[in-house]
């Protein structure tokens, strides 16, 4: 089957924002104006197409990323039909994994900001994730009709808080209840959308006389940005010659693709104004897969069992290249089972083809391929370079796996996922629930790499861990609704970590057992040292054995014995991070030595060394931002101080003050209720994981004592 839409007319984009910035409402308008939906679904009615989960409809928030495909030919039908693959991502920090894995496979992003709230904490988190993958982006300042809306203040915040060069290509015509349209700074025309047909029709008009000076000033900034990195256009500009619309747009596009600037549009999605112009900007300024081929993909060849890195040279515009794709999400569908979402980077694949999972080193056969529209499926026969689709029936694939042609084995750059910071115990109510719970938790863990399940070795309880209270609340709710599991839920527990502050040398571990017959003998000597800076994931094992004093076949058993101890630290049973181990001496017995003996000897050496190396407990520190009316500022700050918070600063807002602080997670349980009480329900807050830091001595002692009692 021949390609219908050229790759140059593809736009793979993500839509991201802080919670309540109007992200899903904007996506719903996109689906309406592009003809996918014939009726607008509203978030507040629980009818948004992209928020299809029951929990999303009940809470009015996005929980899981949803994908869809649509086509756009321009407000004035000025383009050839462009295929836009959209992933709508969550705004709540507890579901940041959805943003992370979406940005890994997207070519461009639309960042949405509230014209009242401006650049909020999750906006900054998402910005860092987009930066991580070098994704070009444009911005849409939404809710221009809201009381307190201030377009220019948000542009200023983007410069100050995100450290970027924002370049408006539109400015609003008035704001709040008087917001009526936008001024196109390239055409220098006003655009008004018709309220009667929900903004489907529009007209260009002259710029209102009271806005001509302001428009000229922002137009000047736009032109200066367009010519900044183009010598030809700069000469033309300096000699007073007029730049064409094509020259301006082409230069701005190149700067967007190079991540030098962020173009700003504006409107009110709820009032059906500005989203159509945003779609035009997506087509005109964001990249096609061809534009990002040179830096978005890291290719690793595998030959003779050795990995060899090479520069990215896949031709993303050529369907005849070997098939390469990345699985970026696993979802459980009640009707078809596992759905594997994947992005095709080169070549093509058809249903029934055999592909190779180069991470798992397994061949699998593609069953059915479907195009997703939120939770609806449209079966298709094949997908090609640039496509985003889902496969039914792949059994061994997990998030981050590379899928490729068995005759052209490559591995794409892996995806990194955050470690959980909060845990709760779950206990099935009945024997039947116990069997179902195991299946449910395993499936949910396969879907979400930031969700972990383990059994506490002391209490034998099932412990689930995630990114926050809401994250775990949703997991438990899904377990109940989708899998019919009844469970009792424990109190939230903080995921502490253990590490060391000092180095110790020549610590011996010896395991000898003689009880008739063949004995056991393992003997190791290790050095233990801390890794800096604290990154909560580091472990290094250095094998410095010389002359075969410990045979090579036992080295991996020694490493494994130490790694098993890292799961349950000697201090309080929490996982151990940021340590290095050097194995440099030991001995063995010709008859009695075995892998198990050396594994046990290594664990004994590690425990002994750890206790001598000035061990400390690390606690998760959260970045907290509270927005409150000014009259409650003192109460809010006082309460944060009582929670061992460290105030970082304050920012003036139209509604009052924004207070930024670092607070231990253990002190933030129940904060939502307390801050509402202190401010008569008028404050709001957001919280996200920032770092691990050494817990104060009295806090660590209390935690260790409580663990010992239990």
Curated annotation (Swiss-Prot):
One term under GO cellular component: cytoplasm
Q: Which UniProt keywords apply?
A: Cytoplasm, Elongation factor, GTP-binding, Nucleotide-binding, Protein biosynthesis
An example of a Pfam family matching this protein is: GTP_EFTU_D2
Subcellular location(s) per record: Cytoplasm
> Its GO biological process terms?
ribosome disassembly
Job of this protein: Catalyzes the GTP-dependent ribosomal translocation step during translation elongation. During this step, the ribosome changes from the pre-translocational (PRE) to the post-translocational (POST) state as the newly formed A-site-bound peptidyl-tRNA and P-site-bound deacylated tRNA move to the P and E sites, respectively. Catalyzes the coordinated movement of the two tRNA molecules, the mRNA and conformational changes in the ribosome.
What protein family is recorded? Belongs to the TRAFAC class translation factor GTPase superfamily. Classic translation factor GTPase family. EF-G/EF-2 subfamily.
Record protein name field: Elongation factor G
Organism of origin is: Buchnera aphidicola subsp. Baizongia pistaciae (strain Bp)
Name of the gene this protein is made from: fusA
């Amino acid at each position: 089957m021949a390609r219908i839409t050229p790759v140059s007319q593809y736009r793979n984009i993500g839509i991201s924002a802080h919670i309540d910035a109007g992200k899903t409402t904007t996506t719903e308008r996109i689906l309406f104006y592009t003809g996918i939906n014939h009726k607008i679904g509203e978030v507040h009615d629980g009818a948004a197409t992209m928020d299809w989960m029951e929990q999303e409809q009940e809470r009015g928030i996005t929980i899981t990323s949803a994908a869809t495909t649509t086509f756009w030919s321009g407000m004035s039908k000025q383009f050839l039909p462009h295929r836009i693959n959209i992933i709508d991502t969550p705004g709540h920090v507890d579901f940041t994994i959805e943003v992370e894995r979406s940005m890994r496979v997207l070519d461009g992003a639309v960042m949405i900001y509230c014209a009242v709230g401006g650049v909020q904490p999750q906006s900054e988190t998402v910005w860092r994730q987009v930066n991580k993958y070098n994704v070009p982006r444009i911005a849409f300042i939404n809710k221009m009709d809201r009381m307190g809306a201030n377009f220019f203040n948000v542009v200023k915040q983007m410069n100050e808080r995100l450290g970027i060069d924002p370049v408006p290509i539109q400015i609003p015509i008035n704001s709040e209840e008087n917001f009526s349209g936008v001024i196109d700074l390239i055409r220098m025309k006003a655009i008004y959308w018709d309220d009667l047909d929900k903004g489907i029709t529009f007209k260009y008009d002259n710029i209102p006389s009271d806005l001509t000076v302001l428009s000229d000033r922002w137009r000047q900034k736009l032109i200066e940005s367009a010519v900044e990195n183009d010598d030809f256009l700069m000469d033309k500009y300096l000699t007073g010659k007029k730049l064409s619309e094509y020259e301006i747009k082409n230069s701005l596009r190149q700067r967007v693709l190079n991540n030098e600037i962020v173009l700003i549009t504006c409107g009110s999605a709820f009032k059906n104004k500005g989203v159509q112009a945003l779609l035009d900007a997506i087509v005109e300024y964001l990249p096609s897969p061809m534009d990002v081929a040179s830096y978005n993909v890291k290719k690793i060849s595998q030959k003779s069992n050795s990995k060899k890195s090479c520069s990215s040279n896949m031709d993303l515009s050529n369907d005849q290249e070997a098939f390469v794709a990345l699985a970026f999400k696993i979802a459980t569908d009640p009707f078809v089972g596992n759905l594997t979402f994947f992005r095709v980077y080169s070549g093509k694949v058809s249903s029934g083809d055999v592909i190779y999972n180069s991470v798992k080193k397994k061949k699998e056969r593609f069953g059915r391929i479907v195009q997703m529209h939120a939770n609806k499926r449209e079966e298709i026969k094949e997908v090609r370079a640039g496509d985003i689709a889902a496969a039914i029936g792949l059994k061994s694939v997990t998030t981050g796996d590379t899928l490729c042609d068995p005759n052209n084995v490559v591995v794409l750059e892996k995806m990194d996922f955050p470690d959980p910071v909060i845990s709760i115990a779950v206990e099935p109510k009945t024997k039947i629930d116990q069997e179902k719970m195991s299946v449910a938790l395993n499936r949910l863990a396969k879907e979400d790499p930031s969700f972990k399940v383990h059994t506490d070795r002391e209490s034998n309880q099932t412990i689930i861990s995630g990114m926050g209270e809401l994250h775990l609340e949703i997991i438990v709710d899904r377990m109940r609704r989708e899998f019919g599991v009844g469970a009792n839920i424990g109190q939230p527990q903080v995921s502490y970590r253990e590490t060391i502050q000092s180095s110790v040398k020549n610590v011996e571990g010896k395991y000898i057992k003689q009880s008739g017959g063949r004995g056991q003998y393992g003997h190791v000597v290790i050095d233990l040292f801390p890794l800096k800076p604290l990154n909560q994931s580091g472990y290094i094992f250095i094998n410095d054995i010389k002359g075969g004093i410990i045979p090579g076949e036992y080295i991996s058993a020694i490493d494994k014995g130490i790694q098993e101890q890292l799961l349950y630290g000697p201090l309080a049973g929490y996982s151990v991070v940021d340590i290095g181990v050097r194995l440099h001496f030991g001995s063995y017995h010709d008859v009695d030595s075995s892998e198990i003996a050396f594994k046990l000897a290594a664990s004994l050496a590690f425990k002994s060394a750890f206790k001598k190396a000035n061990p400390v407990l690390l606690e998760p520190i959260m970045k907290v931002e509270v927005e409150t009316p000014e009259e409650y500022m003192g109460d809010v700050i006082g309460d944060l101080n009582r929670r061992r918070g460290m105030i970082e600063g304050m920012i003036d807002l139209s509604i009052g003050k924004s207070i930024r602080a670092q607070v231990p997670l253990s002190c933030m349980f129940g904060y939502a209720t307390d801050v509402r009480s202190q401010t008569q329900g008028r404050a709001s807050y957001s919280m996200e994981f920032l770092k691990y830091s050494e817990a104060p001595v009295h806090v660590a002692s209390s935690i260790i004592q409580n663990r010992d009692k239990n």
